[in-house]
From Swiss-Prot:
Recorded coiled-coil stretches: none
Short name of one Pfam family: Intu_longin_3
Gene Ontology, cellular component aspect: intracellular membrane-bounded organelle; Mon1-Ccz1 complex
Protein name: Vacuolar fusion protein CCZ1 homolog
Biological process annotations from GO: vesicle-mediated transport
Similarity-based family: Belongs to the CCZ1 family.
Lineage: superkingdom: Eukaryota
Organism: Dictyostelium discoideum
Length: 445
């Protein structure tokens, strides 16, 4: 089969409430959000009805496990049930290619990865929930019409920036890049942040630091693991801090005059990304907190404070406290980042630790190193790893690239060699040498 001439693309994304629209002729009322809006309301309603039918049918065979994936000739669907009565369905078109002597166009049904689709739909919900709270909670406080308006203004810009043909292993792993620090550097950074915390907590007890990032690497976090991942993803993938800091499509959440979170273009700014009167609220631990992000050079500092304490927080004093000793801290991080870059230039690899979500790789997501064949193989290997605790796989691609993948306990390691003339024994020896010399630390606690 030739390379697909039409890539994977979005078919539709819908959020619906199953308890609405129970009377005949009102089924369309179930729909809380549908994209793209160019699909007429009849087809939108049919899509919801088909999803409900699949869920009810599969419950007969697995009452405790809702239907998660549906595969058809033309499309692949992922279904998420994040809240009682709330369902989210993401449908993408399968890619097409030319087959046979008659150059007939055919759908390629096995190209779309289930894990990637599920991770994508989970990220959509988690981002919504972080900045808005749960859908049903909002509905109970306001109305379903208000929920529809909020979903339209918040989810639509988010889903428009997703490139469905470029989702890859990094999407599936959903990890966090950490910058390795020695003890002295760690204590220096911690001392800098702690001094700011203590200064303001003496009068505003709810004030606390949340995250410290340098470029696209996490340095410190005071948050629960999943909260860290969600806010890290927001800063890296939407705000585009780090290597993509000058990206033209970066977006940031701010509160409008009605205290409703909306997306806006980030722009270029040094200091506070959002001013005090427009700070967004994030729902962490079941309660809203104002999120303050401070940017200086390549360092990003995130702080949290209870909304009731926010009016008493002097932004000018906070800025002055952050500027103090900042140059030394930024220089220290810059030096350690350079050492990491030196190390990473020697191999093409991806390492992931499921226990702490640490991901390490010199390969840029959606970068040229991950062509379609490589992406597909990496996704398939990862899916195999999901079913077992330990394994090792060696594959040679049609383009003569060797891929070696290992899973030990909760760690995954993928390394690629473009040595087309090497034998499998030579590649195996190369992996042993590389692991012993450079990657031994990856498989030790």
């Amino acid at each position: 089969m030739s390379v697909p001439i039409v890539e994977t693309s979005l078919h539709y994304f819908v959020i619906y409430c199953s308890k609405l629209g129970q009377k005949e002729g009102t089924e369309h009322e179930k729909i809380l959000f549908f994209y793209p809006p160019t699909i007429n309301i009849g087809e939108q309603t049919n899509s919801v009805g088909i999803s409900e039918a699949y869920v009810l049918f599969t419950k007969q065979f697995s009452p405790g496990q809702p239907c998660e994936f549906i595969h058809t000739k033309k499309s692949t669907l992922a279904l998420l049930h994040p809240e009682e009565d709330i369902w989210m369905v993401l449908s993408v078109y399968n890619p097409t290619g030319i087959t046979g002597k008659d150059n007939k166009r055919e759908y390629i049904e096995d190209e779309v990865d289930d894990i990637i689709l599920m991770k994508t739909i989970q990220q959509i919900y988690q981002t919504w929930q972080t900045f808005n709270g749960s859908i049903m909670s909002l509905a109970s406080k306001t109305s379903y019409d208000n929920v529809r308006k909020r979903l339209e203004s918040f989810v639509k810009p988010y889903i428009q920036q997703i490139q469905f043909d470029q989702l890859d292993l990094f999407t599936s792993l959903d990890g966090i890049k950490f910058l390795p620090l020695n003890k002295n550097v760690y204590l220096t950074i911690f001392g800098y942040i702690n001094s700011v915390d203590l200064h303001f907590q003496s009068t505003l007890s709810s004030f606390r630091f949340g995250l410290v990032l340098y470029k696209d690497n996490l340095i410190l976090s005071s948050l629960e693991q999943n909260e860290t991942r969600i806010l890290y993803n927001y800063l890296i993938n939407m705000v585009k801090v780090g290597p993509d800091i000058n990206s033209s499509n970066s977006m940031i959440v701010k509160n409008n005059s009605n205290n409703i979170p909306i997306w806006q273009t980030k722009g270029v700014r040094t200091g506070f990304m959002i001013q005090k009167d427009s700070l967004p609220m994030v729902w962490l631990g079941g309660k809203p907190q104002a999120m303050i992000v401070y940017e200086q050079k390549d360092t990003f500092l995130l702080f949290l404070i209870d909304p009731s304490d926010l009016p008493q927080l002097p932004f000018e004093d906070l800025s002055a406290s952050l500027v103090q000793n900042f140059e030394f801290v930024n220089l220290t991080l810059e030096q350690h980042y350079a050492k990491k870059a030196n190390f990473d230039e020697q191999y093409k690899y991806i390492y992931f630790n499921q226990m702490n979500l640490a991901i390490r790789s010199p390969i840029k997501p959606k970068g040229p190193e991950l062509n379609k064949e490589t992406m597909k193989l990496l996704n398939e290997i990862h899916a195999d790893f999901e079913g077992g605790l330990s394994s090792e796989i060696i594959v040679k691609t049609q383009q003569d690239r060797w891929i070696v993948a290992k899973k030990i306990d909760f760690r995954e390691f993928y390394i690629m060699f473009d040595n087309k003339n090497s034998s499998i024994l030579e590649i195996n020896e190369e992996v042993k040498n590389a692991t012993t010399k450079f990657f031994k630390f990856l498989f030790t606690d």
